[in-house]
Regions:
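N-terminal leader/linker segments that precede catalytic domains of diphosphate-processing enzymes
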Residues: 1-115, 122-320
Length: 320
């Protein structure tokens, strides 16, 4: 049975619409209008168009952050993807850890990104759930009322090198240089931060779980479902992704199926500053990256060898 970790009133969340200006060299945004709650924000996320993907000025519904999180585990690097049922779009995708930026953090989106890692990527050990550090700052423990966090061996979260083109919040340049794109179907500005998560070697065995909030009966509810970890690892080779997905439970990697899988729009092609797609099929993304799916493991080769052996015995019997 899924375990309820927390309930929130969505009306407590407030954000602001944005005015965004983009040129081929940089992008800037600033808040406009009146604060909106979660429901009002969803209602405002309607498709927009821009005449030139490199140069435009437009008003958008909200600011979102995503984290392309690289986990180092047993001397290998993996990207972290999480499963999400997107209630506002009626689909299920694998996406980067992500969330909405509240009004008071519009000029500090990195702070929101760090909190999203703490909320959506849960690391379990036999002694409890790992706490985390970003540089010298403790990450929040969002489910401390329901889960036992251990501080003795925290994971560490560090920023990686950012995108080439700068992004400004008002007159303030975001030092971490997140990748930015305007998602036209939802009229939102999205910032993607590259981060690395190191798990202490002593914290073994580990299991990884994803927890996300769902809107239920006018409440935001977060549940932990052990039978559906909903967190997937994509292995990297020399920094490039491989066409494989795994879940991790008690230090054991288990392959995850990819049939009919869709990835969120952050994996789709970006044209200038804009992304036009709602989502992208797993197979199409592999093709876009120049990859092919791994061949399915079958017993054909083993069966063929056995058949040859039997054929040899049969021939031997006939020649006698």
């Amino acid at each position: 049975m899924p375990r309820t970790l927390i309930r929130k009133n969505p009306s407590n969340f407030k954000t602001l619409p944005l005015f965004v200006e983009a040129t081929p060299e940089s992008l800037s945004y600033q808040s406009v209008g009146m604060p909106m709650n979660f429901t009002q924000t969803l209602q405002r996320r309607r498709k927009v168009e821009v005449p030139d993907p490199e140069r435009f000025a437009t008003e958008l519904a909200n600011l979102g952050v995503s984290i392309r999180l690289t986990i180092s585990w047993q001397n290998r690097d993996y990207w972290v993807l999480v499963r999400q049922r997107r209630q506002d779009r009626g689909d299920v995708v694998l996406k980067l850890i992500s969330g909405y930026v509240p009004a008071h953090e519009l000029t500090l989106p990195l702070h929101t990104a760090i909190q999203e890692v703490a909320e959506e990527c849960l690391i379990e050990t036999p002694q409890g759930w790992l706490s985390g550090l970003f540089k010298d700052t403790w990450l929040p423990a969002p489910y401390a009322s329901a889960l036992h966090y251990r501080e003795a061996m925290p994971f560490t979260l560090t920023p990686l090198s950012g995108a080439a083109r700068p992004v400004r919040a008002g007159n303030l340049t975001l030092l971490e240089r997140p990748r930015a794109y305007v998602h036209l179907p939802t009229a939102s500005l999205q910032l993607i931060y590259d981060m690395r998560l190191e798990i202490p070697k002593e914290a073994r065995p580990i299991s990884l779980f994803h927890v996300d909030e769902m809107l239920e009966n006018d409440q935001l509810v977060a549940r932990l479902n052990r039978s559906k970890p909903d967190l997937y690892l994509m292995p990297l080779e020399n920094g490039s992704p491989l066409p494989e997905l795994y879940t991790l439970k008690r230090d054991k990697l288990s392959p995850a199926g990819t049939r009919g899988l869709y990835l969120a729009e952050s994996f789709a092609a970006q044209d200038g500053w804009v992304v036009r797609e709602e989502r992208i099929r797993w197979k199409d993304w592999l093709r876009q990256q120049g990859m092919t799916p791994p061949p399915k493991k079958t017993g054909l080769k083993r069966l063929t060898s056995k058949a040859r052996e039997l054929l040899g015995l049969a021939r031997g019997s006939l020649s006698k």
